[in-house]
Amino acid sequence: MSIERTNPLIPITAISQRNLNEGAQEARKTGNAQTKAMAGDTSVKLSEAQKKLVQPSNQDINVEKVARLKAAIADGTLTMDSSKIAEALFREAAESITK
């Protein structure tokens, strides 16, 4: 049995990288032309309900409770009932198993 010397492998990453760069440049040119062509044709009208949803609202967050929690954390007086946390975790795990 004889072992013949083989030619070293030439990586093709340099070739594929060049092809990727050329493709990206073409895509940028085409994308810019399409963006310029479409810029004046687009308009959006929001309904009154959508405008209300976009506006920030304090009704979603109990600001007073958040302030109390922040103060308790800062003072170091916040107490946590670990049994309630454990019960909620077990309940949630049981619900996810039965679904």
UniProtKB/Swiss-Prot annotation:
A biological-process GO annotation: bacterial-type flagellum organization
KW Zinc-finger (keyword) present: no
Claim: Kinase is one of the keywords in the record: no
A Pfam family: FlgM
Top-level taxon in the UniProt lineage: Bacteria
Matching InterPro entries: Anti-sigma-28_factor_FlgM_sf (IPR035890), FlgM (IPR007412), FlgM_C (IPR031316)
Keyword field: Bacterial flagellum biogenesis, Repressor, Transcription, Transcription regulation
Protein role: Responsible for the coupling of flagellin expression to flagellar assembly by preventing expression of the flagellin genes when a component of the middle class of proteins is defective. It negatively regulates flagellar genes by inhibiting the activity of FliA by directly binding to FliA.
Assigned protein family: Belongs to the FlgM family.
Name of this chain's protein: Negative regulator of flagellin synthesis
Annotated source species: Proteus mirabilis
Upper taxonomic lineage: Bacteria, Pseudomonadati, Pseudomonadota, Gammaproteobacteria, Enterobacterales
